[in-house]
Amino acid sequence: MPEKLLKITYQGAGPQKKINAYLRMPSQNYTILRREIELYLFQERQLPKCDVRTFWIDADKDEIEIVNQNDYEIFLAKCESNMHVQVAPLAPVEEPKATKQEGSSANAEAPSVDDPSNFTIHDAVECDGCGLAPLIGFRYKCVQCSNYDLCQKCELAHKHPEHLMLRMPTNNGPGMVDAWFTGPGLGRRSGRRSRGHCPFQETNQADPAGEPARDSRRERRQARRHAGVLTQFVEMMTNLPLNTTTATAPAEPQKPKAAEQTESPPQAEPTVTAEKAAESEAKPTEPKKVNTDQSVPRTEDPVTTPRSTQPTTPVINLDNISQIVPPEYMSAGIEILNNFSEMFSKIIDTTEGGDSGIFAPSTTPSAENKKPEEQGQSSGQSGASSANQSAVPSAAPSANQSNVPSANQSATPSISGSIPDAQLETEPLNPKPSETTTETEQERRRSDSLDPEWQLIDNAYSANNSNLINLDTTNPTAAPQEPVRDFGQLGELLRQHMNEEARVEQASANTQTAQVDTVSTSTSTTSVTTNSVGTSPAAPDDKRTVPVYHTDESINKSIHAMMAMGFSNEGAWLTQLLESVQGNISAALDVMNVSQNRN
């Protein structure tokens, strides 16, 4: 039997060629085989001694390692016909390079002798990384942990890398670090960082005798607020008083001098602005104090009040706010401002004019100071307003005299009236508008609309509405009392009208079978409607005065019923609305409710 031979191939490290050789099959033991290979390569061949690994190549050209006796027996079974073992040196570990890196890091960790941080000693502070106590050098305090400190060597070694560390160069640092961390700066809160002064340095250099500035107090007040979605909107509302005082200041010299000496000019009374809403947010429990502050003339504020050198934040456009703030928050904020405006207007009217019985002076010049051209123009406007009031027909004359308020006598563009009841109590209308041209000492002012949600429908009426309403300031006690609105009667009218609509629908369903019955049913319905309104029996002359708004009888009756409830048909908007819903009052009220919510 021929002797078995084992072929070995050695590829050494470096540019030397690989070595191929045959060995007599030494043994079936892997340890003896490995000893024979090392003896041949490193003693007989004089090759550099190193650790080697043995493997063989299978039919798939893959390297199969031979590590123990089991691997060697598998090799003998697989390669019995052609035994070929590959020998290669193990990959050397780069120990010199690692030693060099350790030396460089040791040199970097060793601080310089002249470093001033070596002389800083933090008493009663222990390094949680190496246990150095007291801590010498820079102290690194973890912001997120309750009590975790590192020395500068441990921080350089990147211990505790997952949290934010704060460097403290001295021993007099604050105990609580969280108070000095806030969110992204908005408005005046970012002024502290933009001006570049440190809060620690500011406390050391602050003058105890000096009074803090106005902006600093506002910064502290705003710093207590949490940053949220409406932070930018709240800051805009707090800046509104500073912007409105400069805008209303040029209009004050136009007032009469006598009014300035005797009484203070009520700047906030003619129009309810967002300034009142901002004041009500700041002091909602002190409404009377706000009214007494308004009695002080505002012309002295720019002179006596010191202004800071910091520029005020400009008023943000509402279009930009609508892109930042969600629509539901925006609508809720506008509704809150409207409620505050209405509340403040009622408080001002009742406290200034209702209790004392003396109305506030007008902000517009009187008829004595007007030029002849302006007097002629005002007289023309008053004549046009009186003509406009008399030109609009009324659906129920007796209801206008007893139950319907006087605001319904004129054509109103709003659905439920734009002048509330509280304002009508303190601002009675002049019962004699034709005598306004003769009484030159009578002052005039605009009527306020405290409900900004309603929109004008008729442009012609909006031009006539610019006329001023005369106020009787000479004899306020003789003002007529406002008639009380009878909601019970209006509800009864609505109920009767709904019954009438049901009867009309039932009658129209039977028109194909009994036309004669339909005519009698409509006739009886008309008689019931005439009796339900509660008016006196119509005379032949009175029938001509009743206006016809629509050719359809049911729609025309619906229009008269809604006008009796206080709605206006100016511009035929009520006719178009009831025509679109086939005279159904319930559907018309639903449509108006949806349109009001959208506005």
From Swiss-Prot:
SMART domains associated with the record: UBA (SM00165), ZnF_ZZ (SM00291)
Consequence when changing residue 60 to Y: In strain: BPL_1A, BPL_1G, BPL_2A, BPL_2G, BPL_2H, BPL_3C, BPL_4A, BPL_4C, BPL_4G, BPL_5H, BPL_6H, BPL_7C, BPL_10E, BPL_11C, BPL_11H, BPL_12A and WashingtonFast
Cross-referenced PROSITE patterns: PB1 (PS51745), UBA (PS50030), ZF_ZZ_1 (PS01357), ZF_ZZ_2 (PS50135)
Disruption phenotype: Males are sterile, spermatids exhibit degenerated mitochondria. Reduced activation of the Drs promoter. Double mutants for ref(2)P and scny die 96 hours after egg laying.
Transmembrane domains' residue ranges: none
Binding-site list for Zn(2+) 2: 142, 145, 160, 163
GO cellular component: aggresome; amphisome; autophagosome; cytoplasm; nucleus
Top-rank taxon, per record: Eukaryota
Residues in Sequence repeats: 386-393, 399-406, 407-413
Ranges for region 3 X 8 AA repeats of S-A-N-Q-S-X-X-P: 386-413
Chain positions found as Phosphoserine: 447
Residue ranges, annotated region (Disordered): 95-115, 184-224, 245-319, 352-453, 507-545
Zn-finger region bounds: ZZ-type: 122-173
Effect of residue 32 to A: In strain: AfricaFast, BPL_1A, BPL_1B, BPL_1D, BPL_1G, BPL_2A, BPL_2B, BPL_2C, BPL_2D, BPL_2E, BPL_2G, BPL_2H, BPL_3B, BPL_3C, BPL_3D, BPL_3E, BPL_3F, BPL_4A, BPL_4C, BPL_4E, BPL_4G, BPL_5A, BPL_5D, BPL_5F, BPL_5G, BPL_5H, BPL_6A, BPL_6B, BPL_6D, BPL_6E, BPL_6F, BPL_6H, BPL_7C, BPL_7E, BPL_7F, BPL_8A, BPL_8C, BPL_8D, BPL_8E, BPL_8F, BPL_9A, BPL_9C, BPL_9F, BPL_9H, BPL_10C, BPL_10D, BPL_10E, BPL_10G, BPL_11B, BPL_11C, BPL_11D, BPL_11E, BPL_11F, BPL_11G, BPL_11H, BPL_12A, BPL_12B, BPL_12C, BPL_13A, BPL_13D, BPL_13F, FloridaFast, Florida1Slow, Paris and WashingtonFast
Consequence when changing residue 393 to L: In strain: BPL_1H, BPL_3H, BPL_4B, BPL_5E, BPL_7B, BPL_7H, BPL_8G, BPL_10H and BPL_13C
Location of the protein in the cell: Nucleus; Cytoplasm
Composition bias, Polar residues: 305-319, 397-417
PANTHER family for this protein: SEQUESTOSOME 1-RELATED, SEQUESTOSOME-1
Assembly notes: Interacts with aPKC and Traf6.
Record function comment: Required for selective autophagy activation by ubiquitinated proteins. Implicated in sigma rhabdovirus multiplication and necessary for male fertility. Involved in activating transcription of Drs.
UniProt-recorded name of the protein: Protein ref(2)P
Species the sequence originates in: Drosophila melanogaster
Source taxonomy: Eukaryota, Metazoa, Ecdysozoa, Arthropoda, Hexapoda
